[in-house]
Swiss-Prot record:
Keywords: Viral baseplate protein, Viral tail protein, Virion. It comes from the Viruses. This is Putative baseplate protein gp29. Belongs to the P2likevirus gpJ protein family. InterPro entries: Baseplate_J-like (IPR006949), Phage_Baseplate_Assmbl_Protein (IPR052399). Putative baseplate protein. Disulfide bonds: none annotated. The keyword Hydrolase does not apply. It is found in: Virion. The keyword Nucleus does not apply.
């Protein structure tokens, strides 16, 4: 891209190479006739030339690498892009903390049980990281109720805390009378989000610019949904052609991490439908991206030449499971390729996908012996319907 900006300067007649700048300086010096000692052997002339040429070269390079690219939305970044976004009423979305509920189960329902604010619920170690939720308010589980939801918030901001059901199930400090704790399906009421990236803000800018007339088309709905939700605009998918009758359309929302819960969907629908942010005659409803479930079998082979103890084997198996789950958006702690709607993972593409994943597993977890494990994973309904999908390494 920098070559394009360099070409722009060259076409305008501005020298961009050091030799060109030197030649231009020498030409101007000769025209003025103020300096006669211009021998290449002269220390004075070499000093004057360096003083004139080097700063111009620095400024030219900075102009090509920083100034010109940041004058255009497509190539601008950070504060420069922020200034561009201000022109259409946008700004970087700040990082937010995940909020939701975790269910506490009592040992007995014959008495009340109080869960104090500040109680911590955490995950097992996922790729050497432990995620924690904190109870936000004191909650009483009354007599006669065995299990009840307790409001929680993530320890830190970010999308990594939007884990799937079952990850948060450990109390680092035991509570008398509590037999179990777990985040269930639909536990998220407000997903956490990372600070918006340059590319994500650029996409929202493009959407905002295309919807400047405020006609209620896809770009407008994408803009308003992305504003209220912890989503980038490319995670919002529309179904047109009146799926629920004339004037109707559906929007399907996809989180980068975790499952899009119904309380979160309800929040977005209230904003779009009940608070007046829809067009005349429009009928748009947001849904979570539909899912199907498939059994995947993963075979882990440990190298016979390397001794691996039973405890370490179990750790490796757990890490491999978490890595595979990351590909299906249940966590965000591994650099694996994610599944996306309208992406077919069958036949050759499926094999290629698992070849890549297998290579990453091999690089991350070497070992000994053989181990097989079957896991249940999420897959999107856009994929071809299959009762089972098996990949082996």
């Amino acid at each position: 891209m920098s070559e394009n900006f360099k070409q722009m300067l060259a076409e305008s007649g501005l020298p961009t190479e050091e030799t060109q700048i030197r030649q231009e300086f020498e030409r101007l010096t000769a025209e003025e006739g103020l300096i006669t000692n211009t021998s290449r052997m002269s220390p004075f002339w070499r000093l004057i030339t360096a003083i004139a040429v080097k700063p111009v070269k620095w400024l030219t390079d900075h102009l090509i690498a920083e100034i010109l690219p940041n004058l255009f939305v497509k190539t601008a970044k950070d504060s420069w892009l922020q200034i561009q976004a201000w022109a259409v009423g946008l700004d970087f979305k700040a990082a937010t903390k995940a909020e939701g509920v975790v269910h506490f189960t009592k040992e007995s329902d014959v008495t009340d049980l109080t869960i104090k604010a500040g109680t911590v619920i955490q995950t097992e170690r996922i790729n050497d990281v432990i995620f924690r939720l904190i109870v936000t308010q004191e909650t009483i589980i009354p007599k006669g109720v065995l299990r009840a939801p307790v409001p929680v918030i993530a320890e830190q901001a970010g999308a990594n805390f939007n884990l799937a059901a079952g990850y948060y199930r450990i109390l680092p400090e035991s509570i008398a009378g509590v037999s179990a704790v777990e985040n269930l399906e639909d536990w998220l009421t407000s997903p956490g989000a990372d600070r918006e990236t340059n590319d994500e803000l650029r996409e929202r800018y493009r959407t905002q610019f295309s919807s400047v007339g405020q006609h209620h088309i896809d770009s407008v709905y994408k803009g308003m949904i992305a504003k209220v939700a912890a989503l980038s605009v490319d995670r919002i998918y529309f179904k047109h052609d009146a799926p629920r009758g004339p004037g109707t359309a559906n929007a399907y929302l996809l989180l980068d991490t975790g499952v899009t819960s119904q309380p979160f969907i309800d929040k977005v629908n209230r904003y779009v439908r009940d608070e007046g942010f829809h067009g005349h005659g429009d009928d748009l409803i947001c849904y979570a991206m539909p899912e199907t479930k498939h059994n995947l079998t993963c075979a882990i082979y440990f190298q016979p030449s390397i001794f691996v103890g039973d405890v370490r084997k179990q750790e490796i198996v757990q890490q491999v499971e978490n890595m595979i789950r990351c590909a299906f958006r249940e966590n965000n702690n591994y650099g694996v390729t994610r599944t996306y709607p309208f992406t077919v993972l069958v036949g050759r593409n499926w094999a290629r996908k698992f070849t890549t994943t297998s290579a990453k597993l091999h690089l991350s977890y070497g070992g000994k012996s053989t181990f097989k494990a079957s896991y249940l994973f999420h897959a999107f309904s856009n994929y071809p319907s299959q009762s089972k999908s098996k990949g082996q390494k």
